[in-house]
Amino acid sequence: MQREFVSGAGLGLRRALLEPLGAGDEVRVDFLEVAPENWIGIGGRLGRQFRELTERLPFLCHGLSLNLGGYAPLDMSLLRAIKGFIEQHGIRAYSEHLSACADDGQLYDLMPLPFSDESVRRVAERVRVVQDVLERPLIVENVSAYARLPGELEEVDFVRAVLEEADCQLLLDVNNVYVNACNFGFDAHAYIAAMPSRRIAYLHMAGHDEQGASLKIDTHGAPVCDPVWELLAHAYACHGERPTLLERDFNLPPLSELYAETDRIRELQRRSGEAQLRSLGYGT
């Protein structure tokens, strides 16, 4: 039986956070997210600590290596392992990147896709296969990029087409929208507004690195910047409050600093909820 989805503000779980999160009775986030590839088969002390957290908090999985946009056959053994992991730990949902990461071997990076009708059809077919194997919906994420491949579609139209063709949900990564808007010169606000509200499952927030004035790199290694916070508020205004998760992969600060960012997410969610009530004639 599929469990209820998550709500509120979440945090990406990294191994360095196991001890701090498990040290006290109070965990100030509403859910956690992990890459299943990093935890499948982990036992011993780390495995016990991980299990303790999955028994205390709702969890999501965010995959790294399914290669949804690639041409190589889907890794069915990996898919079956992910399915077992999801069932073992009561994971609420599974998401993957709209990218390619393998071609006659693992590329160890998330490569951009051509925004073409052919890519839409290929990716949608692979998404449907994944959903059939996992026996649950798949959530796909818009990715950051630093080069464009030839294609007749704009990124926003490509993402929308995949969602409709595959009949799947979206993990809207707000920082990735900002990074790509800066790198390729499109309107981040219009992109977010154009996403279909009924398809948006949850959101990601993260920091990035600036390589000069014209290039931004999605690193997950810095605090969220003010323009990305503003885009999150815009996303809530367009689509309503959604569960939102903070990613931080390296340069990890004390847990209190990460909590400050997840608290800020909650505050924006609260304001969004109040604005929605006012629009319906409640409150002042």
UniProtKB/Swiss-Prot annotation:
<protein>
    <recommendedName>
        <fullName>UPF0276 protein PA14_21580</fullName>
    </recommendedName>
</protein>
<comment type="similarity">
    <text>Belongs to the UPF0276 family.</text>
</comment>
<dbReference type="InterPro" id="IPR036237">
    <property type="entry name" value="Xyl_isomerase-like_sf"/>
</dbReference>
<dbReference type="InterPro" id="IPR007801">
    <property type="entry name" value="MbnB/TglH/ChrH"/>
</dbReference>
<dbReference type="Pfam" id="PF05114">
    <property type="entry name" value="MbnB_TglH_ChrH"/>
</dbReference>
